[in-house]
A protein has these predicted regions:
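Short, solvent-exposed loop/turn segments at conserved positions within beta-propeller repeat blades
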Residues: 54-57, 109-114
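Conserved small/polar residues in nucleotide/adenosyl-binding loops
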Residues: 133-136
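Blade-loop segments of beta-propeller domains
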Residues: 71-106
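Beta-propeller domains
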Residues: 50-73
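Bacterial Sec-dependent N-terminal signal peptides
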Residues: 1-22
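Beta-propeller blade signature
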Residues: 64, 117-123
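Beta-strand-rich domains and repeat architectures in extracellular enzymes and scaffolds
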Residues: 29-56
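Beta-strand initiation motifs
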Residues: 22-25, 68-72, 124-131
């Protein structure tokens, strides 16, 4: 009988502890129009970007230390990349060997065909430079 009481007490304490836990974030973590999000971690900082229906400037860029509190720090591109004309969407960030890469989709100025472009930066905050476009 005493074992039953101990098990009941342990169960109650476990349930009370589980109920006391609080969420550390509340959705949305980044408010506003930002579909197709991508998040990377560089050292102890997180960076996020995504598609924005507000088309320009292109791709809002956010920073956070804890994945809860985000602050917009700029855009991947302040000016439209020279080879593009419209339909900027679905950027992806990658960080490798001290460089940050942003792959993104846009329509080519000459014929309106969608392509994937790539830009690089020495740090996640930018500035980002599009790699040279060639017709090859």
């Amino acid at each position: 009988m005493q074992m039953k009481h101990l098990l009941l007490l342990a169960s109650l304490l476990t349930c009370m502890g589980a109920g006391a836990q609080q969420a550390t974030f509340r959705n949305p973590v980044i408010a506003g129009d930002m579909a197709d999000p991508t998040v990377i971690r560089v050292d102890n900082t997180y960076y996020a970007t995504g598609t924005s229906s507000e088309w320009a400037p292109y791709y809002p860029l956010f920073r956070s230390k804890d994945l809860v509190n985000w602050r917009q720090i700029g855009h991947l591109f302040e000016q439209q990349p020279a080879w593009t004309r419209s339909s900027f969407w679905a950027p992806e960030l990658f960080h490798r060997n001290g460089k940050t890469y942003a792959y993104y989709t846009a329509r080519r100025k000459t014929d309106g065909t969608s392509y994937i472009g790539v830009a690089t930066a020495d740090k996640p905050e930018g500035p980002y430079t599009c790699l040279l476009y060639t017709s090859d």
